[in-house]
Amino acid sequence: MKNGLAIWHYPHRSVLENVAFFAEQGFDSVSILGYHMDPICADEQQSAELARLINEKGIVLTVHHKLPLDHSEESVSSFKATVDRFAAWQRKYKSIDILSFDVLEPIRDCITPYIDYVLEKVPFSKIALEDFGLTERERQQIEHLKSNERFGYLIDIGHMHIRMHGKRHEGETLMINSPDECPATEQPTAEDFLRAFRSKEFPIFEIHLHSNDGITDLHYFLDDGVLDVKMIADVLKEIDYRGILTIESAPGCMFRCAYPESDKRILKTYEIWKQCIGK
């Protein structure tokens, strides 16, 4: 398992500075937001520097973007243009290990043409959807990809934790309890998480990890909230997870935390995770 970080939550440095900084702190992988990767793809100097850093530091690169915001021609056209730029960059540098996508509510009824477009255009990388396929209707949209070894899941454990508690509903698809994963419970157990992971019908390429209160998507550091991080580490060992684990704590989003405290807290969170995983 590679241990990585979503670096877009630390904006006091540039993207390239964050790649270098967090690689030096011992992270095996870095994840760049798609909206930050796009302008890099359009700049040859930054593109070359990013590829150099990835190779020189010996780390894995993942990129996290969104499928179209809605089905409008404008959104779809913008999405395809960005994917085309990712594809051109990937053909040249071959450095994106996983390209993953959020799926927003307005398009969850039909995402097949969008994910098919990505798989057709972007070479040499795994393609993942975050938390999609929680219902039979959603799974039917990706059924045709079961034989495609490049396609799989990004599972957000923070979101899964909230779904298991079963206290969020009404239009928040990512947070609605999924009985296929686990019945709603006051305090999810290791067996609940094992059942959830084993219920997935596609390979899990990447995991996002952050804590919360079991109700709200707070993206806390790992020493805050009620998620049992050691239990999660034990579960991932039990299923022999060999993908990428990306810490997605988000200082300054749902809770106050700014530089330099944010750097101190995320490095502490990384130490906590390494202790839990036994690294």
State the predicted function of each range:
Residues 1-84, 151-154, 179-183, 188, ...:
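N-terminal pre-domain/capping segments
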Residues 2-7, 30-32, 61-66, 97-101, ...:
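Hydrophobic faces of well-ordered beta-strands that scaffold small-molecule active sites
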Residues 7-16, 33-46, 68-78, 105-111, ...:
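Acidic-and-aromatic substrate-binding clefts and catalytic sites of carbohydrate-active enzymes
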Residues 19-23, 43-57, 85-88, 137-146, ...:
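Short amphipathic alpha-helices and their capping/turn segments at secondary-structure boundaries
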Residues 22, 48-50, 80-81, 145-147, ...:
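Short, hinge-like loop/turn segments at secondary-structure boundaries
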Residues 30, 116-226:
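Acidic/histidine-rich catalytic cores of soluble enzymes
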Residues 53-61, 65, 69-155, 161-162, ...:
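Active-site acidic/histidine proton-transfer and metal-coordination neighborhood
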